[in-house]
A protein has these predicted regions:
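Sec-dependent N-terminal signal peptides
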Residues: 4-14
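Sec/Tat signal peptide C-region and signal peptidase I cleavage site
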Residues: 16-20
Length: 317
């Protein structure tokens, strides 16, 4: 595979979506963080180079950093009792290539069903399922490209819908200076079957990011720019900042701040006239990375009364 051809394909695919994309999208569970490490760094990170299979959900190019024959399990508690769970398995293929398969499940729980008059007629449930295959390829000693193809189904009561999406990722990593730079186009695609006659758009997200370890010390900073095809809100709200404190090769602490989440979750304080985010947008996490076993956990604040916990565990056979 030629590096220039892959990069051109990535940029052309992203630009085609820009023309028709708006803010009304479906399958928004695909926006949620799967990786606890990424969740701890503000919910969006596409540049951290680690032996962490869950990061592949954020950038398929990062699959090349994952050990052969790795099984990864993830779980997240979300707002209003919703939960997500998933699993992935990755292995090294032919020269410079790595493969992976994954599945994600989101359960929104049971909800009250009413008729047009508002009378309760029973209960219904809602859930989303996604299955995917990922391929990454080392284009050179520093460039890696990756692609994820995904089939998605969604259920609300007796109704269902289906969609296909593709993630494209490109990563540049300079190990001598510990620079990592990535460009990712997430959720390119469309709906195959709708709930009704009106089809919804996929939650496309064009992202760019950088990570840098400072002076070979314990600190690594990350900055990710998201939703780069929509500029109808403040530029700073496109940014997600993260900090890793690498205590040893096996242990890290992480913290992040999501500017958009903090702004959107602001509420009026009863004490004064100022709005308060009540720590919305703040996230924290930690990880244990042994040779064969990995464990990651993250806490993220979404609202004064809502937070999420994300767990990842992985084992290399």
């Amino acid at each position: 595979m030629n590096k220039k051809v892959f990069l051109l394909f990535l940029l052309l695919s992203a630009s085609l979506v820009v023309c028709g994309q708006d803010s009304q999208t479906g399958y928004n569970f695909l926006r949620l963080p799967v990786s606890a490490h990424a969740a701890a760094l503000g919910g969006e990170n596409i540049t951290v180079i680690e032996d962490d299979a869950s990061l592949v959900f954020h950038n398929p190019a990062l699959l090349s950093s994952v050990s052969d024959k790795t099984l990864c399990l993830d779980f997240m508690t979300y707002m209003e009792g919703a939960v997500t769970a998933g699993a992935s398995y990755s292995w090294i293929g032919f020269d410079r290539a790595t493969w992976g398969v994954s599945a994600q499940y989101m359960d929104y729980g049971s909800m009250t069903e009413t008729d047009a008059a508002g009378d309760i007629t029973g209960e219904f449930s809602a859930r989303d399922i996604a299955v995917a295959g990922t391929f990454s390829y080392e284009l050179s000693s520093r460039f890696v490209g990756g692609i994820t193809a995904r089939f998605v189904t969604s259920y609300i009561g007796d109704y269902s819908s289906m969609a296909m999406s593709v993630d494209l990722g490109l990563n540049y990593f300079d190990p001598d200076h510990d620079w990592s730079v990535s460009l990712v186009a997430r959720n390119l695609g469309g709906e195959l079957k709708s709930y009704e006659d009106e089809y919804v758009k996929m939650p496309f997200n064009l992202q760019a990011g950088v990570s840098k370890r400072l002076m070979n010390g314990p600190l690594r900073v990350s900055l990710t720019a998201t939703d780069l095809t929509h500029w109808d809100y403040d530029a700073v709200q496109h940014l997600v900042a993260g900090l890793d404190i690498i205590l040893s090769p096996q242990i890290y602490l992480a913290a992040g701040y999501n500017f958009r989440r903090a702004e959107e979750m602001k509420i009026q304080s009863s004490d004064d006239d100022d709005d308060s985010s009540h720590w919305a947008g703040v996230s924290l996490g930690a990880g244990l990375q042994l040779e064969r076993f990995k464990l990651h956990v993250a806490y993220a604040r979404y609202h004064v009364s809502s937070y999420s916990l994300v767990f990842n565990t992985a084992y290399c056979f």
